[in-house]
């Protein structure tokens, strides 16, 4: 407990840099697909923060202040399979540590409606995460896993992730995106451990 309290003091009184990486694919044909939920969360985060996007090297880029911290948000334009190229470039440019970088990603392994932050983990077959692992030095980076479930016939995984959310899911999306933003804001404000305890959903 003293250690957590000390960490909270650091978060409140030291200016820190954070990078939020929403994963997805560029192009109208990919808009509103399950695989692009990282882009959707990033878009809403930037909108609510009264920031705006600029098209820069390897990514759409936005920035804003939150409780004195610098928060940078990117949507890689490298396509999913080269997401690590954009993330590594902007980590270096902005001098953001891997511990302060949050990747927002769709996750087949957890049910739709489940939102879980974790400090590290495997790529679990996700090409965007594989690229990040290969380019950014391993598996020890925070990620926000947005559950999309695995309700698809055998052999149709690609069609499923590149397809739109169904009508019932679309009704729930605004609330889930809103909760995702609260998780990101909490990550910036009080750190990953307390955010996991307070805001992860099953």
Q: How would you name each of these model-derived features?
A:
Residues 2-120, 130-144, 151-156, 171-202:
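Nucleotide and nucleotide-moiety/phosphate-recognizing core
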Residues 125-128:
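Hydrophobic alpha-helical segments within soluble ligand-binding/sensing domains
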């Amino acid at each position: 407990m003293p250690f957590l309290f000390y960490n909270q003091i650091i978060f409140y009184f030291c200016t820190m840099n954070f990078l939020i990486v929403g994963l997805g694919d560029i192009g109208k044909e990919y808009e509103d697909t399950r695989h692009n939920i990282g882009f959707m969360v990033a878009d809403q985060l930037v909108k609510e923060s009264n920031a705006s996007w600029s098209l820069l090297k390897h990514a759409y880029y936005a920035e804003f202040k939150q409780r004195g911290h610098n928060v940078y948000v990117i949507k890689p334009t490298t396509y999913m399979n080269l997401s690590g190229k954009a993330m590594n470039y902007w980590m270096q440019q902005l001098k953001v540590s891997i511990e302060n970088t949050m990747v927002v990603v769709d996750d087949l392994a957890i049910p739709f409606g489940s939102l879980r932050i974790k400090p590290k983990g495997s790529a679990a077959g996700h090409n965007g995460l594989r690229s990040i692992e290969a380019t950014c030095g391993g598996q020890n980076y925070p990620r926000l896993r947005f559950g999309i479930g695995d309700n698809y016939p055998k052999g149709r995984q690609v069609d499923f992730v590149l397809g739109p959310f169904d009508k019932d899911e679309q009704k729930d999306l605004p609330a889930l995106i809103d909760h995702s933003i609260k998780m990101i804001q909490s990550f910036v404000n009080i750190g990953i451990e307390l955010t996991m305890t307070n805001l992860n959903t099953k």
